[in-house]
Amino acid sequence: MSFYRSWIGGTGDLVKKYTSSIKDDVELAEEVVRVMKGHVAHLVEIGSIPKEAGERIIKALEEVDASELLKEEFEDVHEALEKWLIDKLGEEIGGWVGLGRSRNDHVAAAIRLAALRKTERLKEEACRLRCALAKRALEYADCPMPSFTHFQPAQVITFGHYLLAIDELLAEFLHILRGVEDLLNRSPLGAGPAGGVRTPLDRRRLAELVGFKEVVENALYASGSRFFALALASAVVSFLAELSRAVDDFIRWNSPVVGYVNSPDSHVSTSSIMPHKRNLVTLEVLRARIAEALGHFAAMSALVMKVGMGYSLDLQEATRHLWAVLNIATEGMAVFRDFIENMAFNCEKSRKDAEAYFTTSSDTAEDEALKGVPFRKAYFQLASAIKAGTARLLTINEALKRPVYGSANTEEVKRAASRRLALCRPKPL
């Protein structure tokens, strides 16, 4: 029987399993223990519990194996931890841990801390991917290829330039994550169930003991809001949606019909009946899981938006969707990085296509305009010449000598990739 529920009556296994979050709490069990240690230490500091009792509780918390708390008989890991302490130390000692706290503020704190830990891992993976992209961008700085708009051959670029576009996405993602971290790194402890507690906690000192930088001021918002979780999931899902576009490109380019990408053997599978197939299954799964991440974010939003400002168990259900989004992103970036590090790009084929599909036409028209011909006139003259088969276009090497910052100019790509690589040694970014 669950510890708290025993005071109002028992329940059957069906209901107990249905409402318990214990399986999902594996994601934050260590943070729950960390929060409890800080809470008890502060209770001792302010003299609200006997010093000896507090010291014994903290010693026990240092010994507990968080994984041992994850038993189905409990509603959640918070209940399991309190019961474990009382069983180990007796009610006269362990019973003090309920003072000045609610599961509402403690679970919010644990989620924030676990999210910070997972965000740090996410940032590390993003930095590793950036370094892999920069290395390959330098390698392919002078490898021409068509860019595609409307999935039609457009302006000539290089594969190195393409890879640096993904790198810039990651740079912006990391910038957003740093802002979200500031939101996460605020303590709800001391907020109690909704309006604070009678115990004279110093909420800023308590935040410091647990490892938070700031405090969420309003107690109702501190315990009941999940805006921080939505903000993090939104940032991650927005990044994944954009990354999926590159994933889709590589899947298309892996087809021998296009023939741009030679995928590593470890990333491909074949057909059960067509032995010639080389299906890029890792990126297909990544593309699918990105779609799942969007679904998890939609579920989070739907769960939160119909709940009043105070805590409801609906918010418990929202948390597992946050973990799913973060895990999909972290694992997916690792897989994508391995692909980038080990794939090969067919520069001969991509150059051939760039030459065949008039990908220097815009540069040719611009050149004519810069020589004194009104651009639209030069544009229509070139269009007529292309249609007639008489166009004299700039070569790829000539077209790529664009002088603007951030262009596909080979030297510009090399400089940008080299700057990025310099940040990767010896420690990524």
Swiss-Prot record:
Keywords: Amino-acid biosynthesis, Arginine biosynthesis, Cytoplasm, Lyase
Localization, UniProt: Cytoplasm
Enzyme Commission number, as recorded: 4.3.2.1
Top-level division of the source organism's lineage: Archaea
InterPro entries per record: Argininosuccinate_lyase, Fumarase/histidase_N, Fumarate_lyase_fam, Fumarate_lyase_N, L-Aspartase-like
Catalytically driven reaction(s): 2-(N(omega)-L-arginino)succinate = fumarate + L-arginine
GO terms classed as biological process: arginine biosynthetic process via ornithine; L-arginine biosynthetic process
Gene Ontology terms for molecular function: argininosuccinate lyase activity
Stretches that traverse the bilayer: none
Pfam families cross-referenced by the UniProt entry: Lyase_1
Pathway: Amino-acid biosynthesis; L-arginine biosynthesis; L-arginine from L-ornithine and carbamoyl phosphate: step 3/3
Major location (coarse): cytoplasm
A single cellular component GO annotation: cytosol
SUPFAM superfamilies assigned to the protein according to its UniProt record, in alphabetical order: L-aspartase-like (SSF48557)
HAMAP family found in the cross-reference section: Arg_succ_lyase
Family: Belongs to the lyase 1 family. Argininosuccinate lyase subfamily.
Protein name per Swiss-Prot or TrEMBL: Argininosuccinate lyase
Organism field: Pyrobaculum aerophilum (strain ATCC 51768 / DSM 7523 / JCM 9630 / CIP 104966 / NBRC 100827 / IM2)
